[in-house]
């Protein structure tokens, strides 16, 4: 008899717990999404998207604004689908707080190709420019193949790491199969040729400028070969 009583007691208590759990879950699901925390976690400050844009996407994905109607995976896919977003993590805490951790793409260079402008990030991924925000970076022009993006990323990083190069070179241009560096002095361009041995070429040209070119009339040059400089 005792065992039977104990068994009935366990069933009763379990039933109460299930009822309370279902009741609490129903109340939780009926709550509105009020506490939203958006974090931009990229290593440099960029503003292609902001808190307002993210909240508009949340409203579009969850028009009822009920926690129970919120599809976390669908919302995360919508954020990740934005071309300027590198990655996104969306999660809901037990207290009902909706969290969005977003990493935006950081442009390495700006590409002018076929009368269109794009940004290219450090992974070699291109994405459209923004009408409301501009990020300062090197301009690259010409018929550049996507396969060349990684080497151009390396070239721009080499230039940006050196104060002389960063201040001296203002753009990169592709003509035919060869690349040229635009300078802020004189009327000349620096011929790089193919995208290979980039560090050696940039260092060689810098040495050429410091030991020879600064003592010359730079206006008389139209092209200087960085291949042999």
PLM features per residue range, with description:
Residues 1-39, 45-66, 70-81, 86-229:
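Charged, solvent-exposed interaction patches on well-folded alpha/beta domains
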